[in-house]
Amino acid sequence: MILDVIVEDKLKRLPEHKKRISEEEMTRLAIESQRVSHSFYDALAKDGLSIISEFKKASPSHGNMNNKITLEKRIKQYGESADAISCLTEEDHFKGSTEYLKQIRQMTDLPIIRKDFIIDPYQVYEAKVIGADAVLLIAAILDDSRFKELYDLAYSLGLDVLCEVHNEEEMQRMLNLDVKIIGINNRNLKTFEVDLDTTKKLADMVTPEMRKAGKLLVSESGVADTDDIKVLAKSGADALLIGTVLMEAPKPEELISEFKEVYNAERK
């Protein structure tokens, strides 16, 4: 399964990172950091639909992005209408880099989430140091004990956590852990097939009381056009994380505005 391969490759990559900057040094840099995070949670909690625009060079399901626009221009475009930015830092399958996130941090005050396959505390400390405001934790690759360890560490460093699920079992685990932000991935990371109904099916497990208490839902993956937006509008998600269609759009800022308009109209 592709997910297993990605995690195996990540395990091989980690020693390279730790060789460049030791675990002790990375921990010290993160703890001593004076950087105040931009609230990822607040960006998603505001009225109306929030959109997390993703920067990535490639993906296993799509291949290389059809995009010759520079990083600087793309982030400037995102900044006109997006609410947060997701940056892929996974090297082998998404052609990401921590350097991209560092550069994006210098270009925008929007909250940035480090999107990677995080399995080690080092990666959380590293996220803080390179300028991230939040990290992605994927339920499918972490048991509850490890998940809670990384989750608590992130919040202790002032980082928000997007907790990703794909099925009922993973959703129930996150509800049991009482996490703040749940990301429902419409793409099965084991087969890479997409089903937009996944968001509504899993969102129905979150009670109105939980929503009133502040639990946020993000729908991830699979958006290609306004028809998809209309489907997801029925799910009740607070935010959408959108990657490929925005990366390949010549004017993503206009597409983001259109998506928000359609979504909010459907919700009325």
UniProtKB/Swiss-Prot annotation:
It comes from the Bacteria. Keywords: Amino-acid biosynthesis, Aromatic amino acid biosynthesis, Decarboxylase, Lyase, Tryptophan biosynthesis. Signal peptide: none annotated. One of its GO terms (molecular function) is phosphoribosylanthranilate isomerase activity. PROSITE patterns: IGPS. Its EC number is 4.1.1.48. It is an enzyme of class 4 (lyase). GO terms for biological process: L-tryptophan biosynthetic process. It holds the Pfam family IGPS. Belongs to the TrpC family. This is Indole-3-glycerol phosphate synthase. It comes from Lachnospira eligens (strain ATCC 27750 / DSM 3376 / VPI C15-48 / C15-B4) (Eubacterium eligens). The gene is trpC.
